[in-house]
Amino acid sequence: MGVFRFISISLAAVSAANAAQILSMPHAQTVPNSYIVMMKDDTSDDDFNHHQSWLQSTHTHNITRRATIQNAGMRHKYNFSKMKGYSGIFDEETIKDIAKDPKVMFVEPDTIISVHGKVEQSNVPSWGLARISNPQPGAGSYIYDSSAGEGITVYSVDTGVDVNHEDFEGRAIWGSNQVNDGDDRDGSGHGTHTSGTMVGKEFGIAKKAKLVAVKVLGNDGSGPTSGIVAGINWSVEHARQNGGTKKAVMNMSLGGSSSSALNRAAAQAVEQGMFLSVAAGNDNQDAQSSSPASEPSVCTVGSSAEDDSRSSFSNWGPAIDLFAPGSNIISARPGGGSQSMSGTSMAAPHVAGLAAYLMALEGISGGAVCDRLKELGTSSITDAGPGTPTNVLINNGGA
């Protein structure tokens, strides 16, 4: 069902006096010996550079002495807005040394984020586009303003995108591969499908918006949190240099265990002016236990079915901002053509696409977009789930 695993965790600090927290994630699938290190907000560039130089020396000393870990060292460096940090493969003694630096905020084990369990059906009616531009279910047309997201750039932080698919009309480009697998394509199909919903000529909402593919999950639909944080970092910097963050949308149809590092990165992207649409997850449980869905500043999206009920798989709870079509959604398939998938993975790009559409039409940006989507939506969802503060289904206001 286009679904992906969301695993709840508890965070326990194990640190020495005056040392940074080393967060424990006992219920998460972790990457062996891989960690994410976040620096405090007041860390200057000079402090950060000094820390990196110290780290290289300390880690080299520890590894030389023990020689227990292969391919060790720093992998990703993060530096945008107030957020500075890095990830890498380190031995236990080096991690303890890192935590003693007073400029370190916390150290977090690197965990696996994933998408999985796709459902493909033939001859399924494409209903999502029609539903978001009509006040009642059952309509057969998508009504929209001809501006159609022009001038807005959408970042697909996902499994990659078939940027040559005919539905993108040359408006999609390859941006970055944080998986570092040397495979700049979408071997999963997930990222191409979500991107088609956002900007495709036939399947999409913002039919004139541009799209940038940011691959953070492998062809098996999974990847480490460290790479996703790097993808967010890359997207923010790319947006700043190409039209500005206030004309940028990011879609994240992914999730996993609660992660302070991932939530912090998502929050910094929003602070920089980007709009973030995030899938709530597909475990029929409280979305508050997963990241980045639990980050308050993003727009967290639950899934609706064709009859305006909450999809049976959709997560619920206080983190939910909106609902959008997510059951049996037809969109682009790598290599050409289309396929049907279900999940909050499919709901989030409806919100991202509509956000791009409204940003072009009304000139709004950032956090104001989620509020505007709530204003335009219809109170249609039945059984929104325990503790869910909204039953609003997105709508474009009838163009």
Curated annotation (Swiss-Prot):
Residues 34-115 form the Inhibitor I9 domain. Residues 175-198, 282-312 are annotated as: Disordered. Keywords: Glycoprotein, Hydrolase, Protease, Secreted, Serine protease, Signal, Virulence, Zymogen. Residues 1-19 form the signal peptide. Its EC number is 3.4.21.-. Glycans are attached at residue 251. Residues 126-399 form the Peptidase S8 domain. This is Subtilisin-like protease 1. It comes from Trichophyton verrucosum (Cattle ringworm fungus). The lineage of its organism: Eukaryota, Fungi, Dikarya, Ascomycota, Pezizomycotina.
